[in-house]
Curated annotation (Swiss-Prot):
Gene3D superfamilies for this protein: Isopropylmalate Dehydrogenase (3.40.718.10)
EC primary class: oxidoreductase
Reported cofactor(s): Mg(2+); Mn(2+)
Species of the source: Bradyrhizobium diazoefficiens (strain JCM 10833 / BCRC 13528 / IAM 13628 / NBRC 14792 / USDA 110)
Keyword Manganese belongs to the record: yes
Subunit structure, interactors included: Homodimer.
Alphabetized PANTHER family for the sequence: 3-ISOPROPYLMALATE DEHYDROGENASE
Pathway assigned to this chain's UniProt record: Amino-acid biosynthesis; L-leucine biosynthesis; L-leucine from 3-methyl-2-oxobutanoate: step 3/4
Protein name: 3-isopropylmalate dehydrogenase 2
């Protein structure tokens, strides 16, 4: 049995609590002989700043580069609001993405039947929802140069951000989306603003070319990003895989997140390119929710997004799709039983702590694997 190297980076706030539930699951998989994971732990974000005055140390970056996958908790909090910008907690995550070459962000939005009434939309609009947003992560307006604020005099300033995309960046993110669609419902919707942005014109052109040349059997639709946002809240189940740029992906994935009822439910994956020789890719998996410092240490955090993120690691880094399916099924079974953490609690359901939810999911997984 192959040994897989995992680096656990719990981070700040509720990060260590929810990571503890993933570690419980990993330990059981190892002891049951189902998989063989070798885990190491490091500091990132505010915890790294407190220890080393950086957002991630060189030692932990080296661990990250050597790992088969990174499981990441959350970073940030008011405690570090005044630290220098270049070592702010979020800079640790940005460096991980940059140094590992993580260009594709996968954000599934799945609505479990037991939580359909927790969504802001009607049950019929979201029940059975299962969409995947593929966001380009390393290009676009967040990284384009120049990025400046200039003093024009007379009390006036000018801010400049630059939206930049090269053909290869669009091609590789398009391939990720099409490859995912082939394993799902075989449909990709590409979203941009070609009506007002030159980068949108190129995006549309390149995605169309990749589709025609390499994936003619996959259905491709194009939609303006603002219209796409409207349709996400009107009838989200029309979508399967949505592929879009960094800025629009940031916005659209957060819109999709709230369709499911709680940010505490949603995982994500950030993937690099497949290495030609090893056939492996660098990858980081993290929950969509933040560090929630207001509830840290109280046992109130929902560990489902963190556990689901580990499930994505099983699927995309270790080719353990069947085991990932069982993790998803275990979560669905626990929710169907009426167990709820505070963020998804409703009348007639049973309140659970972080640990109780994690233990319940592990018990269901053990049943499914018996």
């Amino acid at each position: 049995m192959a040994t897989h190297k995992l680096l656990l980076l719990p981070g700040d706030g509720i990060g260590p609590e929810v990571m503890g539930e993933v570690k419980r699951l990993i330990d059981w998989l190892n002891s049951a002989g189902i998989a063989k994971f070798e885990t190491d732990t490091g500091l990132v974000g505010g915890s790294a700043y407190d220890a080393h005055k950086v957002s991630i140390s060189e030692g932990d970056m080296a661990k990250a580069l050597a790992a088969d996958a990174i499981i990441f908790g959350a970073v940030g909090g008011p405690k570090w609001d005044a630290v220098p910008y270049e070592v702010r907690p979020e800079a640790g995550l940005l460096r991980l993405r940059k140094d590992l070459g993580l260009f594709a962000n996968l954000r599934p939005a799945v609505c479990y039947p037991a939580l359909a009434d927790a969504s802001s939309l009607k049950r019929e609009a979201v029940e059975g929802l299962d969409i995947m947003i593929v966001r380009e992560l390393t290009g676009g307006v967040y990284f384009g140069e120049p990025k400046t604020i200039t003093d024009l005099g007379n009390g006036q300033k000018r801010a400049i951000d630059t939206q930049v995309y090269d053909t290869y960046e669009i091609e590789r993110i398009a391939r990720v989306a099409f490859d995912l669609a082939k394993k799902r419902k075989n449909k990709v919707t590409s979203m941009e603003k070609r009506n007002v942005m030159k980068s949108g014109v190129l995006w549309n052109e390149v995605v169309t070319q990749v589709h025609k040349r390499e994936y003619p059997d996959v259905t491709l639709e194009h939609q303006l990003a603002d219209s796409g946002g409207m349709m996400l809240v009107k009838w989200p189940k029309q979508f399967d895989v949505i592929v879009t740029d960094n800025l629009f992906g940031d916005m659209l994935s957060d819109i999709a997140a709230m369709l499911t009822g709680s940010l505490g439910m949603l995982p994500s994956a950030s993937l690099g390119e497949v290495d030609v020789k090893s056939k492996k890719r660098k990858a980081l998996y993290e929950p969509v929710h933040g560090s929630a410092p207001d509830i840290a240490g109280k046992g109130l955090a929902n560990p489902i997004a963190m556990i689901s993120s580990f499930g994505m690691a099983l699927r995309y880094s270790f080719d353990m799709g069947a085991l990932a399916d069982k993790v998803d099924a275990a979560i669905a079974a626990v929710l169907a039983s009426g167990l709820r953490t505070a963020d998804i609690k409703s009348e007639g359901t049973t309140a659970a702590s972080t640990t109780q939810m994690g233990e319940a999911i592990l018990k269901e997984l053990q049943k499914l694997h018996a």
